[in-house]
């Protein structure tokens, strides 16, 4: 088989710019394009959530992909498929739709992240089975189905059970990438038992009355990856980053590989970015100040000269750092900064951040609606970006930030230490704190602010950050090698 004939289907619960809650969406927006440059044909499947605007993203119906039967144990549901090209590419992205499951705005959640457990369990089963049935109708047979996180973790088991003898699926291999080890898809077993044949439900990884989707995927995928070498070691050996996966991963005979993320340097390039106020580069930095001013207008908060603008962009949950930021707010504001918090998620954190912003309107701003255009403007207009995730497999925001001269201040986890060169005398591209406490965060940010007020040294730091190379090419070559190894070529 020649390299150009390899076909890979990527299956994910989120893809930017259609839906974004985490770095997974950014990965999906750019990595398949990088793989195509390595001689692979890539396509994507994801759910068609109610939040996705058909007109904005030019989705259209595919007549031959309408009324596809999705066989479940006690019933047969129907799905329809819409398609568009991933922006700035020719990669076909298929959106699986059923009004009952996806018309509501909510994304996939589990026992730890949401309340509608029955509805979410039915949704995830329908989606995973629907992906395979859509492939049959489409008649496009991938060599590899690359599943991402727990949302797609049922597919490897389905291929080993009910689809095992289906001629279409013979020879297809599966890869599962763990982006978020702490989001595992813990869902009630009784719904799986009701909707899936016994040979599937009986093989699910089960604890008490719940199924663990991520565990099930880990047990059945042909190859496992995560998004940095250090995080691969962390989830194998450390209790907190591993989130209970250590034992099951240790039993998978060395099939886990860590590959550091890259970014799409065509989409994330301040000299060509159409989503920012004014483009800039290392030899014409005035545009960064224009973006700072535009960001000030966007969040309705005047930015004072000499006061750094610090951003926090995250999903509001404990693992992404919401609790650490909440505990640090008073000390952060005492540093004499403008603080922008952008994200959504747990309503208790959203309320806490909103109350604090309302109490400090000249110093703190909260944005819970963060479309792609705002994300680009924020990255371009900020002076510093705080990344407080307790568990960070790799992350991509820090790479976006450095490319735009926005200096990261991040907790030392996973790919953070593989992508940020820690500031030292005459070198480095960002700041890293190593104790997960408010004092450690505030102390490191205070150090960064001290350098900010030394304009000559700060500009040298900004130049070093902006000239880092975060392109996907190296990671794409590693993945291409793993794919070929998996296919025995």
From Swiss-Prot:
One GO-annotated biological process of the protein: glycogen biosynthetic process
Pathway: Glycan biosynthesis; glycogen biosynthesis
One Pfam family cited in the UniProt record for this chain: Glyco_transf_5
Alphabetical keyword list: Glycogen biosynthesis, Glycosyltransferase, Transferase
Binding-site list for ADP-alpha-D-glucose: 20
Enzyme Commission number(s) from the entry: 2.4.1.21
CDD domains tied to this protein: GT5_Glycogen_synthase_DULL1-like
Keyword Magnesium in annotation: no
SUPFAM superfamilies: UDP-Glycosyltransferase/glycogen phosphorylase
A GO MF term: alpha-1,4-glucan glucosyltransferase (ADP-glucose donor) activity
Catalysed reactions, as listed in the record: [(1->4)-alpha-D-glucosyl](n) + ADP-alpha-D-glucose = [(1->4)-alpha-D-glucosyl](n+1) + ADP + H(+)
PANTHER family hit by this protein: ALPHA AMYLASE DOMAIN-CONTAINING PROTEIN (PTHR45825:SF11), GRANULE-BOUND STARCH SYNTHASE 1, CHLOROPLASTIC/AMYLOPLASTIC (PTHR45825)
HAMAP family: Glycogen_synth
Known role: Synthesizes alpha-1,4-glucan chains using ADP-glucose.
Similarity comment: family membership: Belongs to the glycosyltransferase 1 family. Bacterial/plant glycogen synthase subfamily.
Protein name: Glycogen synthase
Organism annotation: Chlorobium luteolum (strain DSM 273 / BCRC 81028 / 2530) (Pelodictyon luteolum)
